Design a protein with these regions (language model features):
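Flexible assembly/topogenesis modules
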Residues: 1-245
Length: 245
């Protein structure tokens, strides 16, 4: 963690969800915010440190490594047995991707549906391709009807840097097939979950999905991706970044 320099113009924008998205009920209820407060911690540094920072900024920029998060969605109509998104991500390749699927009605907001109920929809194969090359030795295969999905479940640990560590993710194997079917992929070159950043790579990400049974209703696919970027600040407090890649 790094503290933000003083006198840097900072804006925070909060966008709340619709009532029919954040509430589950049988009636038409609504959320009314009566008051809200944002608490921000401020650190006061010693004068010697402040002067040292000012002197350093005369020769170089302050650099802040950040993990940028981008979420993309696409829909699969009911009755389909497979789906492909050729341009899931283009430009800078993400470090990590997590894919989940929910009912389209729940995603758009419905009081009787849970938008965080990530069903498996009888998915039997999911594959990622980077610039046309498959990620991994073979596609991730599973058979939920026979409760055979351990490789996909293990991906929640290998894809998030929790494998071989004395910590979990609060999702059990039983939970995975009952509303927590999330498919994680580590796309970093060294497959390491450390504090270091890797070299930026450019390309495109494609995803292929295959289902055992035809989809009973329209499904929304949600792709969560993490990118490694750097924010730079000069002595005049000008902020420089390039998130377009």
């Amino acid at each position: 963690e790094r503290y933000l320099l003083n006198e840097v113009n900072t804006k925070i924008r909060l966008i709340r969800s619709r009532d029919n998205f954040c509430l589950m009920s049988t009636g038409q209820f609504k959320v009314k915010i009566m008051a809200a407060s944002l608490l921000v911690r401020k650190v006061k540094v010693s004068p010697s440190v402040f002067l040292a920072h000012a002197k350093t900024l005369e020769k170089s920029l302050a650099k802040y490594p950040v993990r940028r998060v981008v979420c993309k969605t696409f829909t699969i109509p009911n009755g389909h047995l497979d789906a492909t998104n050729e341009k899931l991500f283009t430009g800078q390749l993400p470090r990590r991707i997590v894919i989940g699927m929910v009912d389209n009605e729940a995603f758009n907001g419905a009081f009787g549906h849970n938008p965080f109920n990530f069903k498996h929809f009888s998915l039997n194969e999911i594959a990622l391709y980077l610039d046309g090359q498959p990620h991994g030795i073979k596609p991730l295969a599973m058979n939920f009807a026979a409760h055979q999905f351990i490789h996909a479940y293990q991906g929640l640990f290998t894809g998030t840097g929790k494998e071989n560590r004395d910590e979990g993710n609060c999702i059990s194997r039983t939970d995975f097939e009952n509303g927590y079917a999330l498919y994680a992929f580590d796309l970093s070159p060294d497959l390491g979950e450390d504090d270091h950043f890797n070299l930026t790579r450019q390309g495109g990400v494609r995803v292929d999905l295959k289902f055992t049974d035809a989809l009973p209703n329209t499904v929304t696919v949600i792709a969560y991706a993490e990118f490694e970027n750097v924010i730079e600040i000069d002595r005049n407090r000008n902020v420089v970044f390039d998130f377009g890649l």
